[in-house]
Structures are given as C-alpha cells and as structure tokens.
C-alpha cells in the first residue's frame, strides 16, 4: 500500500495543487466538491462522465495528497475544502467569465496566492472573508493590487479585531483605547494622524485615523 501511495505522490508535481484550485475556480460545482472531498473520490470519478478531464485530474491530485497528508497538511486540506465549498456559491457563469478573461496563467497566479494565504491563516472564520474579496475582484469592485493587499491584511489580523473594525469604523479621529484598536494599528488598518493639545487637567493624546483601505474593506464585507 505504501509503495502504491509513493508512486501516486511521485506523480503530483509541485504546482499540481494550484492547477487543481484553478480548475475548481473555473468549473467547480457542488457535485464536484462533494466527490473530491470523499475518501473514494478517485474511484467515484471513474463512473462520472459529465465532467471534464481537467476536473478528474484535479480531484485525483487532491485525493492523493489527502491520503498521504501529515497532520499539518490535513489542516491545510481542510481549509482548502472549506474555501472550495464557498467558491461554488459564486455563480458559475461569473467564474467562467472571469476565467476566460484572465486565462489559465491568470487563474494559476490567483491560485498560488490564495493557497499561500490559506496555508498561513489560523482562523477558519476568515475564509468567508477571503471568498468575498475574491468575488469583489471578479466583479471589478477592486483591482488586483487592492485584492492582494486586503487578503494579506486579513491574513495577519485576528478575526475578533476584524469584527471590531467592521462595528466601529469611523471617519473621525480616534484615540487607541483597547487591544483591538492596538491590533488594528499594528496591522495597518489605522495610521497616525496627530496629537491633541494638552490642558492644565489633561495630557495631550495621540490620535489616529482608519485608512482608506480599511473603509473600503468595511464596505465590501459583511461579518456576522
């Protein structure tokens, strides 16, 4: 059994997983996701005729990796599965139109970046946010640079701090008063604005503003 698995793993190239995600972005459906997350996916695919050869290949790559995965790899595959399940909620015609626009190289570039972020995030709750940002990019609401910047900001910010950001975003200057605001400042959602005048009874205080990208994030994202 180990010998068979080693031979299967030898067929999985370094970029196979990004190719698989690119295929799911373009062609993924609920049936596809249910099959590729099954332990018997490679067998089930043999009886499925209404999917493309690319999808069959993508599913088998994922299946092989899942079988041989270490615990950290299994955690990563769990994040990828959750991402793919959310991905199919984006209308298929929208995904296919985007795929046609950027081509396979563009999809692969997206996939490599997404996988890098998924590999680092520790809170599964963030995955819904990542999907919302990807759909916003597909819809042309944000450009690629803004999309990537927001993805990286989300990656390094605690989910509870993102909840705080959404609930407390303001155009007014603020004084840092709690750990959430300190976290948002440290991770680039706030910038230094100036200092208040001190009085006989009160010391001067440093004040900060939410960044434009923080405001843009809050316009795009619904967090429950």
Where are these regions (language model features)?
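A sequence-composition feature that detects small, non-aromatic residues
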Residues: 10, 20, 41-42, 47, ...
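Short, flexible helical or helix-coil boundary motifs
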Residues: 28, 32, 39, 72, ...
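Generic surface-pattern signal
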Residues: 26, 30, 37, 57, ...
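Amphipathic, membrane-active segments
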Residues: 60-117
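Membrane-inserting effector segments that mediate pore formation, membrane fusion
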Residues: 6-83
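Long, helix-rich, hydrophobic modules that act as membrane-proximal anchors or helical bundle/coiled-coil regulators
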Residues: 107-224
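Detector for Asparagine
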Residues: 6, 15-22, 34, 39, ...
